[in-house]
């Protein structure tokens, strides 16, 4: 149970990187059954055919299921098919729901969720790529992949490691890692800062150590933020069943192979530690302490 606690993190780097990375170079994707999942610029996105007709009757069912007021749904003329869009502000995050007409004349729902302000141009560009079936198949990672595409470098998966989502890898007792590719380094820094603040505010996580450390992240000299969390409440009880008491997290943002990347690496106090690197095996594959 302890390895189900995930973080998206923050580091504080003072370099700038003004070049924008193109959308498809930032996009990650997987397929699972009849759903597609995407990640880009801090968004988590699902695309699913609702199997409902693109008509009044179909929308009535869709809106009722999703607790949507029909008056809140508005067409977007920049989307390349018939559509309705609903924006919802939730506590701590925002959502955009695009109901689009697909080739079967049924409703496909492209659902965006993001911690921070929505980026309409990113949403519209991705929806149009989906509508026109222009997402390259090579971007879809297999669910049972035996390697990690880490910012353009393939890393063999350790035994017993598995994906729990897009760019989320967990290795019981050997560390866990989450990452995302962003348009600019500044975007990555902003995203990780927002997420770190959100995680720190959770009552179940109490930071007992916070410090900046020098590391080599994918062979690039980098400052990482190292935080040790004391875990409380129900999560503490679940983690304690397997011996976990504290969680050490490294928050990093850096440009790697011309890709601005935000990454979190974490491990429990009773995880396996490499005597040479001082880190669990998974973390040791992408980072070294200086």
Stretches with model-predicted labels:
Residues 1-23:
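Bacterial Sec-dependent N-terminal signal peptides
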Residues 21-104, 203-259:
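Signature of long, low-cysteine stretches enriched in small and polar/charged residues
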Residues 147-222, 226, 247:
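Flexible, glycine-rich surface segments
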Residues 130, 195-204, 253, 286:
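Hydrophobic, Leu/Ile/Phe/Ala-enriched alpha-helical segments that form helix-helix packing faces
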